[in-house]
Amino acid sequence: PLQKGKIWVDGIDLARLHPIQRARYLAVVPQARNLPSSFSVYQSVLLGRTPYLGWLGRTGKTDHHIVERALEQTRLTSLAQRRVGELSGGEQQRVLLARALAQDTPILLLDEPTTHLDLEHQAVFLNLLRELTVQKNLTVLIVLHDLNLAGLYADQVALLLKGSVHLTGKPADVLTAQNLSRVYNVPVNVVPHPEYGTPLVLPDGKSKRNEITTQDLKS
């Protein structure tokens, strides 16, 4: 629950909405994979339609069409009848995204969504989100520790320092060597991506501040 402040979407205070109404505004892809292991992939993604089912909980053709589209977008169609408990961590992460897409909201919140994905599925995942921001005018907010992915895919970034927003702006303006060295307390180099020109963050591996001593291991 909200502890302080207010969150407004299109002039509406989200805290004043019933949870079902709020679920039609924003969907969440959590870091923890909280999926029923005995459910099939299809059943798990169908849960995203809950805010639209009414008191009887009956699904219709539209609901199943949206679920099938979400499965296709996340490359899960071939796994639709598999039990979630049989999937790898990366596959379960894609199920969470498919469930959120099936919720069909204008806002999508994601917490470290690429943690359990290999390089191919990271690219598929983030490219899909980029496409949806254009095709559906979707607003996507992502928490990422991978600064290179943030620099490559984000339109705007917010850099945190000690739990508060330190800087916001375009990746090239925020993800600079000076800013990152201060926030992370370690020297870094930032170079342009060879094809896209976006910032690539490289730790300064030869810096003495990066050396691990026996005293560090004892502390």
Feature locations, PLM:
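Catalytic Walker B motif of ABC-type/P-loop ATPase nucleotide-binding domains
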Residues: 108-112
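Conserved ABC ATPase "signature" region
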Residues: 46, 61-79, 104
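H-loop (His-switch) and adjacent beta-strand-loop-beta switch element
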Residues: 157-170
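Conserved ABC ATPase signature
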Residues: 83-87, 91
